[in-house]
């Protein structure tokens, strides 16, 4: 490790290295910067990981091509109803904790709103008009990182439904009925002709279907080749957003509040979020969690 007495020296070297990289130019123009090509902020974050040409954010990456050098990320994580092979799909299941880590645009608390009064466990549930409305106004990066109920992939809306809430006249309560989308007998997933569990799960009956109700979106390619097991998306090892957050963290440790504000909020602004006036270390760590999900930079998401 590094002796505590040399901590500031270490942070200063980190900050200097980050700022040197920020200042690299060719013909007066910066070499690296945040990827900002689309006004649709969710699509912009999707494209960041799929567009290889004119992408100033990627500093180091492992590249793949269609000429025998591919990977299987898309086929390994494809939604259940879109599989091209029986033994593929949903190998990585995002959890609710990651979904809720993404803030709402107008509220930094990303917890999903399920009850009219969140402080009362007996409060009535909120009845949303559309299945995806509970995720409205989330940080645009969420929909580019995770597929949720109501998401679309390959021009097809995912059918994610845990079961049916059926009214019981005798008890005056709803009871939850769960079906089995993986059963060979389709009738086991029907209630009075209505499908119980969605065709994309969730279910614990099969390894290749989501168990949490969510699928990975980041790095997923909407192409026949990728769905069939030949993905060519690059894997970033180091990108400009990490340079900014490394610089922000080092500046925080050195007490350079103006630099913390600048570097940290560049990442948030690109995502369409409001700036934070005085970012804390917890804010920086949280930003890393949502910005770099599934990029092998954290042990726990």
Language model features: what each stretch is:
Residues 1-89, 109, 113-301:
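Acidic/polar-rich alpha-helix caps and helix-coil junctions
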């Amino acid at each position: 490790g590094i002796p505590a007495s040399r901590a500031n020296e270490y942070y200063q070297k980190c900050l200097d290295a980050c700022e040197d990289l920020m200042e690299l130019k060719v013909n007066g123009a910066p070499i690296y910067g945040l990827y900002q090509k689309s006004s649709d902020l969710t699509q912009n974050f999707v494209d960041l990981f799929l567009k290889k040409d004119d992408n100033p954010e990627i500093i180091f990456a492992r590249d793949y091509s269609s000429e025998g050098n591919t990977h299987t990320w898309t086929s390994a994580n494809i939604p259940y109803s879109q599989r091209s092979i029986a033994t593929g799909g949903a190998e990585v299941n995002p959890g609710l904790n990651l979904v809720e880590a993404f803030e709402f645009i107008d509220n930094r608390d990303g917890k999903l709103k399920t009850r009219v009064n969140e402080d009362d466990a007996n409060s009535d549930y909120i009845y949303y008009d559309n299945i995806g409305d509970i995720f409205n106004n989330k940080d645009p990066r969420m929909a580019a990182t995770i597929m949720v109920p109501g998401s679309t992939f390959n021009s097809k809306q995912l059918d994610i439904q845990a079961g049916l809430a059926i009214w019981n006249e005798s008890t005056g309560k709803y009871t939850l009925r769960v079906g089995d989308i993986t059963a060979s007998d389709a009738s086991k997933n029907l209630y009075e002709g209505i499908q119980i569990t969605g065709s994309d799960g969730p279910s614990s009956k099969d390894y290749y279907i989501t168990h949490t109700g969510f699928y990975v979106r980041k790095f997923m390619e909407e192409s026949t080749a990728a769905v069939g097991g030949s993905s060519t998306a690059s894997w970033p090892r180091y990108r400009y957003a990490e340079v900014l957050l490394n610089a922000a963290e080092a500046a925080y440790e050195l007490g350079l509040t103006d630099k913390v504000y600048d570097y940290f909020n560049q990442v948030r602004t690109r995502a369409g979020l409001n700036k934070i006036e005085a970012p804390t270390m917890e804010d920086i760590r949280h930003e890393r969690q949502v910005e770099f999900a599934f990029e092998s930079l954290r042990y726990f998401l």
